[in-house]
Amino acid sequence: MIESIIYNVAVMVAGIYLFHRLQYSENKIMVFSKGYVTVLMTIVALLLAAYPIPFHQEYLVHLTFVPLLFLGRFTNMGYTLVSAVIVALVEVFAFGNSLLYGVVLIVIGIIVSMVGPFLKQNDIVALVILNLISVIILLILSIFSPLYDLTEIAFLVPISFVLTIASAITFVDMWHFFSLVTRYENEDKYDYLTGLGNVKEFDRHLNHVSQIAEDKNESLALLLIDIDGFKDVNDTYSHKSGDAVLKQMSQLLKNYVPKQFQIFRNGGEEFSVVIRNYSLDQSVKLAENIRTGVEKSSFHLPNKEVIKLSVSIGVGYLSQDDHKSQRKVFKDADDMVHVAKNEGRNQVMFNPIIKL
């Protein structure tokens, strides 16, 4: 029995390690996706099905439902249900388990996938809650089915919780570790908080786009977007609230900026958008759409409060006939941001100075 318990725990931990190792391998052969997680966890479930835990030489305790908890938490109902059906069919037709148990696996898959993504607790607690739900389902089964009894369920409860907690701790710990590795690898290009390009990448990109615009005789525009009163958010509510605002602001910008243009967080509360081959009118209209969108939006803080914000936007613009100077377009946009701030904030300004 001890060997079986060790095997079950080892299979789950090894599966979780393999999940992270392939995802973060140097060659990046495997790309993270819900389908990839489903395949891996289905294989883990089948390995658990092949080696159930014997109890008193009378019972065989199956822990094949535990990988379904991870799928219910980290994927969706479609993926979880596919995995549950595959595991149930193998349990019934390959390993001779009862048809009723196969149905229960599918029911567990459906329920945990309905509940898992919406649990507000951290991942470890959420997985323990999903395990408790699964045990309750099996307990109900033992009451109404002669194939299972309370003794088997009583043994299943501590074993399943040990497996779930050990697997969850391993999963979260490795996730945090490899997330730090990814952050270190990407810190030269990306802002870790918003996922947007950082100021270093902004400089490289602006220089590159400026050269293309010069070579192709195209216009070049730059929007510098500054959140009004952002310091007050940090001072009044906390830096955690400020981070939440920055994340929401980055998502809002993604919704308004056309896909062909890149968005950057230059640092602090300043964002930028590099635009090529747009007219001045188009560039200013885009800036005004962003300003209006922010003004109409509500920003949700971690303490459940909702606040309103505004942005000041400076537009730097070089026409087709202008020499595409990276420094000039940045200076023009930066000067216009300061003018917008001095003119009362929540405005779009560009040169020649026109207020919208």
Curated annotation (Swiss-Prot):
<dbReference type="GO" id="GO:0071555">
    <property type="term" value="P:cell wall organization"/>
</dbReference>
<feature type="domain" description="GGDEF">
    <location>
        <begin position="218"/>
        <end position="353"/>
    </location>
</feature>
<feature type="transmembrane region" description="Helical">
    <location>
        <begin position="124"/>
        <end position="144"/>
    </location>
</feature>
<keyword id="KW-1003">Cell membrane</keyword>
<feature type="transmembrane region" description="Helical">
    <location>
        <begin position="35"/>
        <end position="55"/>
    </location>
</feature>
<protein>
    <recommendedName>
        <fullName>Uncharacterized membrane protein SH2145</fullName>
    </recommendedName>
</protein>
<dbReference type="Pfam" id="PF00990">
    <property type="entry name" value="GGDEF"/>
</dbReference>
<dbReference type="Pfam" id="PF07694">
    <property type="entry name" value="5TM-5TMR_LYT"/>
</dbReference>
<keyword id="KW-0812">Transmembrane</keyword>
<dbReference type="GO" id="GO:0005886">
    <property type="term" value="C:plasma membrane"/>
</dbReference>
<dbReference type="InterPro" id="IPR000160">
    <property type="entry name" value="GGDEF_dom"/>
</dbReference>
<keyword id="KW-0472">Membrane</keyword>
<dbReference type="GO" id="GO:0052621">
    <property type="term" value="F:diguanylate cyclase activity"/>
</dbReference>
<keyword id="KW-1133">Transmembrane helix</keyword>
<feature type="transmembrane region" description="Helical">
    <location>
        <begin position="2"/>
        <end position="22"/>
    </location>
</feature>
<dbReference type="InterPro" id="IPR043128">
    <property type="entry name" value="Rev_trsase/Diguanyl_cyclase"/>
</dbReference>
<dbReference type="InterPro" id="IPR011620">
    <property type="entry name" value="Sig_transdc_His_kinase_LytS_TM"/>
</dbReference>
<feature type="transmembrane region" description="Helical">
    <location>
        <begin position="99"/>
        <end position="119"/>
    </location>
</feature>
<feature type="transmembrane region" description="Helical">
    <location>
        <begin position="76"/>
        <end position="96"/>
    </location>
</feature>
<dbReference type="GO" id="GO:1902201">
    <property type="term" value="P:negative regulation of bacterial-type flagellum-dependent cell motility"/>
</dbReference>
<feature type="transmembrane region" description="Helical">
    <location>
        <begin position="152"/>
        <end position="172"/>
    </location>
</feature>
<dbReference type="InterPro" id="IPR050469">
    <property type="entry name" value="Diguanylate_Cyclase"/>
</dbReference>
<dbReference type="InterPro" id="IPR029787">
    <property type="entry name" value="Nucleotide_cyclase"/>
</dbReference>
<dbReference type="GO" id="GO:0043709">
    <property type="term" value="P:cell adhesion involved in single-species biofilm formation"/>
</dbReference>
<dbReference type="GO" id="GO:0000155">
    <property type="term" value="F:phosphorelay sensor kinase activity"/>
</dbReference>
